[in-house]
Amino acid sequence: RFTDAGHLLGSSEVELWLTEGDVERKIVFSGDVGNVDQPILNDPQPVAETDYLVVESTYGNRLHGERPDYVGALTEILQQTFDRGGTVVIPSFAVGRTQEMLYFIREIKEQGRVHGHDGFPVYVDSPLANEATSIFLQCPTENLDPEARELVRSGVNPLWFEGLRTSVPSHQCECRAEGHPFCQRNVRCGAYPASFKA
């Protein structure tokens, strides 16, 4: 049986029951398991019990506390940086984190939380991130958490906002007259990264 691992769109835990003679054993296998109360995706479905558990465990030696206020922290960073005339660059994994950042930035812009800089542009420099985002937008709404599901059902795209610019092939990159780069290709962090410029 597959259960929702809540890590990435479509991620699953696999529950297997094996019988040998009169003895039945349950084995659960999973890669990463997501956190609860994250935006966009459903929380991971708990596994009631198992005889053997095989799971990715990068953070398996600690308990996660309450989820930080990412929207508040990001708002503060954007506000302070824009007030100084700066640019915010956010290195992000192309799948999962990029969509989460888009979700947060849409919320920040929708609520007008960055004062005096309402129309700031956001550039996502990653064709892979753009493809992943389009897959998120095509998935059945039952794969989304209740808040994102309600946004989609009410006609709101939770991963798009005014001022969002996505990367284009490098031969189409050009600088605009006012000097703002249309496309940034100079930040690379880890495998399959995306970079944001706001």
Regions found by a protein language model. Give the residues of each.
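Hard-cation-handling environments
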Residues: 77-198
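His/Asp/Glu-rich metal-coordinating catalytic cores
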Residues: 1-100, 106-117
